[in-house]
Amino acid sequence: FGSDHYVGRYMKMMFTASDYDDQICRVILNAQAYTGHHVFADSANNGPRMAALLQEWIPYLEETYNLGGSAEKRFLAGHSSGGWTAMWLQVNNPDEFGGAWVLAPDPLDFHYFQTVDLYAENANMYVDSEGAEVPLARMGLKPVLLYKDFVSMDDVLKDGGQIGSFEAVFSPKGEDGRPVQMFNRETGAVNPEVIAYWKKYDIRSIIEDNWEELSPKLSGKINIIAGVLDTFYLEPAVIALNNMFEEKDFDAMVRVIENGDHGSVFRTTVIREMDEYIANKLDLPNIQQKTKK
């Protein structure tokens, strides 16, 4: 969230540390819209973003730069909102991509929308069931930002803020032409009717409800890394999804890094690991050998 395609300039050093950098074409996408990060999901408010990517942009890119044009040569990767995007695109288009690397993703399970269970009776974004204020961010174990305070700032900024970005993707369009708010801004009370609409964007729910169809197509393609102390409390959804994978003996790589936070999971070693995964899938030769084997 908040970055665009120019971030590739600052990531170049991380990329060039890979043994396979000269054999991999990296495309940095810009998911920023007037409403915020559209996460390449088709939505009532942002329009057919996923459809445009799959039907227009990728074919154009592959034809223009002779990139092969086959699903097994396409891989997804992203961090934070970009991590959610990578998972969303892979799960909804399992035959179009060869694998996804998902780092510190936005909530993959809306039972764990950070620290709030959106499906719970009387769910509230500001206070929990015991009346304690709900935190949105922390440093280590210490909460440093409350949800209510963040929402107050987000609403002042209007379109393009994080909360509004979620609603622009997940919510229906209201009679006023704007995304329907998921919760009451004064009280924090969650609107269950809106959450019922949101469920079609709940990635864990999509996988579980379509398990027989999706599991063989996604096997070996899912790689998720999060920090056990994610700054924005995003790791519980990752842990819940991994628990489901383990119960079903599903082939996925999910790693929750001890002492890791939101930013520290995105590192050069992960880029190298991701590239080795791609190299193994495509049987690429290691002709650079920048790292010791």
What residue spans do the PLM features occupy?
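Non-catalytic cap/lid and distal C-terminal segments of serine-dependent acyl enzymes
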Residues: F1-K293
